[in-house]
Amino acid sequence: MKLLLSNDDGVHAPGLSALADELKNIAEIRVIAPDRDHSGASNSLTLTRPLILQKTSQGFFAVDGTPTDCVHMGLSEMFGYDAERVVSGINSHANLGDDVLYSGTVAAAMEGRFLAQPAIAVSLVNRGQENYATAAKVVANLLLRQLKSPIAPRTVLNVNVPDVPLEDIRGIQLTRLGHRLKGGEPHEIVDPRGRKRYWIAAAGEGDDAGPGTDFYPVEHNYVSITPIHVDMTRYDAFNQLQDWLGETE
């Protein structure tokens, strides 16, 4: 099994190192990640300048671009590595519900959708304990399970792991994406030169977050797994829109 690893927290993030340390025991790995934190980068590509690729002291590859840039390059013939699947993470915070629209972690995994094997995006629902080893063990177990029982290609498994020791994990639950409330207003600050600057507010609290959603299990020390893909079509709106379009003819 040949894995391409990436993330959005940056090439030096502890979650990426923990993931690489665990997965190298069960697979051949290659790591390519942004040279700095690109949280919230979503599926953006760098198209207005060339990218720089450097090798770190750990043997990882660092790119001065987005998570999607990294996986795009890592899967290219130029990179010379015939990866079978992409694993992205371990993100330092949750990627639940609407978070997947903004997440560079999920985007990096999604860029691996063209491979025959499903990609994995893994996040630690941080409670300040930094149990990255727990999340890494969960991913290793999922990969070994998929070898025995493959699932549909062009699928991304969005995995959220409670920030607890492995022995406190109660199990795994299959979930759908929940929803968050809208985030707060941008926070205004003034820099030392008197200029106004703004911080984007944190994500909103869970709204549709009950049983069956990805929010619920992690609050009860279960791992949440949500299968996602790129088709964002709202199929249940077809009939209403068809009626509306018919009225305009």
Swiss-Prot record:
Detail the disulphide connectivity of this chain as listed in its UniProt entry. none
The answer to whether the entry has keyword Cytoplasm is yes
GO CC annotations, alphabetized: cytoplasm
Residues holding a divalent metal cation = D8, D9, S39, N91
Keyword S-adenosyl-L-methionine (UniProt): no
Q: Which reaction does it catalyse?
A: a ribonucleoside 5'-phosphate + H2O = a ribonucleoside + phosphate
Report the principal subcellular site. Answer: cytoplasm
Keyword annotations for this protein? Cytoplasm, Hydrolase, Metal-binding, Nucleotide-binding
Query: What does the entry comment about cofactor binding?
Result: Binds 1 divalent metal cation per subunit.
Concerning HAMAP family, the annotation shows: SurE
Q: What does this protein do?
A: Nucleotidase that shows phosphatase activity on nucleoside 5'-monophosphates.
- Provide the protein name: 5'-nucleotidase SurE
Q: Which organism is this protein's natural source?
A: Hahella chejuensis (strain KCTC 2396)
Q: Which gene encodes it?
A: surE
